[in-house]
Amino acid sequence: MKSLKLALMGLALLTAASAAQAQKEQFIPILSYRVGPYAAGGSGYFGGTIDYFNLVNANGGINGVKLTWEECETEYNASKGVECYERLKKKNGGATAVEPLSTGIAYGLLDRVAQDKIPMTTFGYGSANAADGRVFTWVYPIGTSYWSQAAAMIAYLGQKEGGLDKLKGKKIVHLYHDSAFGKEPIPVLDALAAKHGFELVKIPVAHPGNTQESQWLQIRQAKPDYVILWGWGVMNPTALKAAAKFGYPREKMLGVWWAGSEEDVIPAGDAAKGYTSAAFSAPGTSFPVMQDIAKKVYGAGKGNLEDKTRQGSIYHTRGVVYGIVIVEAIRKAQEKYGKGQVMTAEQVRWGLENLNLSDARIKELGAAGMFPPIKTTCADHEGSGMVKFQTWDGTGFKPVTPFMSGDRDLVRKMVDESAAKYAAEKKITPRDCSKEG
């Protein structure tokens, strides 16, 4: 009997120890896409995020709390994305936060995450009005939204012309992926066209965008001063090749940051030279954090990229930067709710809302120069709005501007108006940020 009691006590202690160990894991669902026409972006981005998670774990976790995750393949499909979210949201103690990397999926999850009280990040994409945290408590378009990016693009074109006033009478084509993603910047582009007197010509491209003959015939007839390429996946090299075929100078083309990766330009060959795109993070392997990933993650055989030469590429570093952001949000939550403890989704939401990634902190993380400072608040879930521009010279993207912003006042006014309209439609009472802790 005594032996049985000792055995039972030992089993109880072992079970308690196992439970305690399990409680020290922070679960993050990963709604990824590694197949289909957008696989290059998904595999690079999510590969970078997972590489950073592995680096954090190799360094002991977040104050001892290890990260754990599970992937679900969405194929960049809205309905599959929602299915993946529902499948993973309650696993392993519940989701910390969700990042779909798809405007369509993000729209599909907008009401669900609010109901489930799980924060959703839309890092550099998604619905721009979610920057108003008074209305969108659970959504975080952290960094720079499409509206802010569109405003920065017009500011950059204004610089090229010698001033925004020089855009008056110009013609700018918005060549866009015919989806929620491609349509998202149109309200801001329309407002800026009205303000500065340029003509905006909107030309949609059907998914996936590997046929653009009719669109480039329209562009040739329109004779625009500039073409904004708001593309994704195979649409981008197709557009660059078509521009060369129809004699449109790539120096007059300006791409969204999802049209500004190596995978977008290399397939286009010489047709891509001189092409400029936006960026909200910088590529490269020289950053200390990237060197640590190479040594501690890839050196240990745990690297997520199948093609190791993609380390430091634009999509890879962008994914690393997202990993930094979500890890720092968890760390911030621990400061308030318990250092070394597993955070709930609601606690991580607070962390996302009180991020302060200063230049000094970014340097401490080994990422100085990779991305601009980010500081979020209850009212501002974006926290930056900065963009830099880069030009492809045939071998690599070279920065042509520092991080810069566009018409922030116009964008914020439109964010507030759009969020207020959404709140009225959904019968949401905006939060009083003065009462938030």
Predicted regions and their residues:
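Short beta-strand segments enriched in small/hydrophobic residues
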Residues: 25-42, 101, 170-177
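Venus flytrap/periplasmic-binding-protein-like
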Residues: 74, 120-122, 126-131, 208, ...
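Extracellular/periplasmic periplasmic-binding protein-like sensory domains
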Residues: 243-323
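Segments of small-molecule ligand-sensing domains
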Residues: 303-316, 327-402, 406
